[in-house]
Amino acid sequence: MAKFTALITLQPGADRAAFARNIGDTTLAQPTLPGVFDGGDLILHRQVANEAVPSDAAIAHIDSAVYEPIGGGAHEPGLRNGVYRCLLLAVKPGTPEATVRQFESETLAMPHYIGTIRNWRLSRVTKASGARVWTHVWEQEYADIGGLLGPYMTNPYHWARVDRWFDPECPEWIVDTRLCHSFCAFERSVLNP
């Protein structure tokens, strides 16, 4: 089933926690944690049956995507009180399909090398809005913030294999440098409840 995620940036002074509480029917609506990059103030995640983007005077900007999973897995289904991370990215137009599939395959292999990724899903976007025409959503769950900011960010597989797709100085570069890296706390797993 298709999924919907929105990274919502609020007007200065807006109450993030109150806004999240008033969102309504969602799988996840949480304020982002410090350290996000173009990741908004709030992450909203729900099933595609309701892909309506919230409309409110408190909203300054939204990056969102409707997407279909192409792969994923679970090392810890039912994870509780962890950290959900969402990366919206755009593969450059004209990239050969075989290259895109290699990028997807190497991204999906990350949890086999980075043990702090507890649950994960990679998806292709079917409908996007915001700063870019997003093509992929890469979601992960961690037991704590240290798993994301430590082992995930510093693992050699990440830097030696996957990062070359994101680095304009590498010949394999295919991902637009403007991306949305966002994360928040959750009470109950979003990816594998």
Q: For each of these PLM feature ranges, what is it?
A:
Residues 1-157, 177-193:
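Short S/T/G/P-rich N-terminal loop/turn motif that feeds into the first structured element of a domain
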Residues 158-167, 171-172, 176:
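Outer-membrane beta-barrel domain signature
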